[in-house]
Amino acid sequence: MGMSEIAKAAQKDKAIGGADRDSHTPMMQQYLRIKAQHPDTLLFYRMGDFYELFFDDAEKAARLLDITLTTRGQSAGTPIRMAGVPFHAVEQYLARLVKLGESVVIAEQVGEPGATKGPMERAVSRIVTPGTLTDAALLDDRIDSLLLAATLHRGVLGLAWLNLANGDLRVMECPAEQLQAQFERLRPAEVLVPDGLALPLVESLSPVLRRLADWQFDAGNGERLLTAHFGTRDLAGFDAEGLPVALAAAAALFEYARSTQRQSLEHVTGLRVEREAEYLRLDAATRRNLELTETLRGEASPTLFSLLDSCITSMGSRWLRHALHHPLRDRGVAAQRHGAVGELAGSDAGAPADIGDARMLGAVRAALRGVADVDRITARIALRSARPRDLAALSDSLARLPQLHAALGTPQAPLLCDLLAAIAVPDNALDLLVRAVAAEPAAAVRDGGVIAPGFDAELDELRGIQSNCGEFLLALEVRERERSGIATLKVEFNKVHGFYIEVSHANTGKVPDDYRRRQTLKNAERYITPELKAFEDKALSAQERALAREKLLYEALLEALAAHIPALQRIARALACLDGLGAFAEAAVRHSYVCPQFSAQPGVDIIGGRHPVVERQVEDFISNNCRLAPTRRMLLITGPNMGGKSTFMRQVALIALLAHVGAFVPARSARLGPLDAIFTRIGASDDLASGRSTFMVEMTEASAILHGATEQSLVLMDEIGRGTSTFDGLALAFAIARHLLEKNRCLTLFATHYFELTRLNGDYPECANVHLDAVEHAHRIVFLHAVEDGPASQSYGIEVAALAGIPGSVVREAKRRLRALENREVGNGPQADLFAALPDREPATPSHPALTALAELDPDTLSPREALERLYALKRMTA
């Protein structure tokens, strides 16, 4: 039976007990009812110790999980295809499915066996989707997993996103053209959009796209849902009024999240409105080109994040990743972070961090070791899905807070003072955890041993019955041996037959009259007595009652801890921030970074700047200065390929970005004026998914810069125009450079191989020529990587080609053509004549045979003996 058949069965048989339903077995009737409510989602249907999947779900799961597909029995005359996974290993299978973008409905057994006629009652307990994960086994501990809803109205993009694993809910409105930039910033795991909205770009940007009914995106409903959830009359306290498109997205998001969890989201305690002006604008191309958290090849390292992430906790790593994608416009907040980093690193403002003075940093990082993911544990407490070991880890983490207080001492930096106050130990919560949770609890409540001894008298009594079992059996064995006269009599227990007295066949004639046979073995008989039976009932009952009592106590414990959720969230945020700032301080100490300075004067002034990632990959990295100001708005950068132009430009952008996220920077000094955005146009490749060529991608990115850059924007333009013909490219590069100088008036680093552009500074004094030089030494090119004033003398493109292994004959032909081009006037003719007008050979001029022979030599292909022979031949020619 496929999905279409299931849907038909559900449609035909809406009334329970209808004629069509009677054709299925009672269990399959129950399955079909649940499946009809979730037709597009895999259904894990609990049956004893397994979660079973049926029909098309079984085939799909077997294919994705590489599990066995089988057929068992029939329903309505159709063989039932099925596959299953053991319940104790379900999380690992769920993790694999979620990584593949699948969603799963979990239907648990909620009734007691035999309590009702027919199959045991089952109900959906949760829905697992890529954007609504909270279980540690399903999440990447260093990456936030976001659920995002997006809708569009009259050119305004409304976004709402929720990190269900910590309760962080945010909304924003922005122009529709920022869709790609926002998706690149947030990287949602799952996206919700209205069914009637055509957003083809979303489909290419999101791995998991879910279309919901248009009516679910309703601003009025969004406001009602949120005010009811927060218990407020309106959303003015969250500064969320006047955002109808964002609230429409929030309506769909919040309802969807609640439906997957099957409960209220009490850990969502606030709503944050993000505004465009909060952060430096980084478009999608800039985030990729600067390789903040992912290389251009899609790898995790080497990136700025991989360099800086020395965080002790997973919370700190997530804070750091978020910070790198959200450079602050509020320079006061960024400066507060600088102050905290400086105090942790033991550095005065403007001076490089000194490893010898970083005593506070070492103490703080030592105190953070052993701190668990308080952020996500708190969310699981709110959702009542926290495991016993989560609570033990939370208890240990809270117990370390006094050590962290001692490590911070009496800080001077205002931000450190705020963090110190935020990590105040919630004594009631810690006391409750210490008293209630066993030191080393079992993985699951069903296994017992979760609640600590002494916490509950009734549980202790029930456990006492179980623990005294051995003593009772030993005493009973001694008494029964004396009573029966059977010296080899044994009193034992197993899970199948319970308690019994074992007597060998040779002694069965001696057993007392009150012995009742329980089992016959080859060499012995097993008996039970009224006394032993009474104890068995009591012991086994005590075990069941103890487990039931422990489950009840655990649920009550989660309920009690839920009252501390706001305090635990405050602590988690502070720990994450402190750990992230510690990573900034660690980088400053290890790599000699300095505190950047903010200035009210426009411009960028960097002395001895370095690329933070590249300098760790190479030896003897060459630092460079960069000065941009109102009288020096554009640096026109020329120089050879591989000379370091792109590295120089990227390092300027990264230094600016690091300063605005609150980190120290790789330079001897850095002073930055006001910035509102960083744009980059560096490199390009075909966008096959969107049907765009390399040149189209290049022009699209350039267009975004020309339309979006302001006087306070930092713009990086690398070899614009190279994707088309020489004259077209030169014309475009010239026009774009002039537009940036005249219209945008932004701070620009403009790298080019078009030397004609170096004449721009004749018309625009604010355009300065700089170059990265190279020299030829011993017939090889040596890149100096130092930025010098003035234009470059040549590009050394042919020499770089030779370094890349281009055959010598090709290199020689290229040099010959280059000389011919340099020795003639190109004029204003069409580019097609550039090579067509060249003769196949240079004009014939008398030359010595020895010179001709020497020109034809390729020394790289000669053996020592052949080289010596050619040398003697040349000598003879000149004799």
UniProtKB/Swiss-Prot annotation:
Positions with a binding annotation for ATP: G639, P640, N641, M642, G643, G644, K645, S646
Signal peptide region: none
InterPro entries named among the record's database cross-references: DNA_mismatch_repair_MutS, DNA_mismatch_repair_MutS-lik_N, DNA_mismatch_repair_MutS/MSH, DNA_mismatch_repair_MutS_C, DNA_mismatch_repair_MutS_clamp, DNA_mismatch_repair_MutS_core, DNA_mismatch_repair_MutS_N, DNA_mismatch_repair_MutS_sf
One GO MF term attached to the UniProt entry: ATP-dependent DNA damage sensor activity
A GO cellular-component term linked to this record: cytosol
Keywords assigned: ATP-binding, DNA damage, DNA repair, DNA-binding, Nucleotide-binding
Name of the protein: DNA mismatch repair protein MutS
Organism: Aromatoleum aromaticum (strain DSM 19018 / LMG 30748 / EbN1) (Azoarcus sp. (strain EbN1))
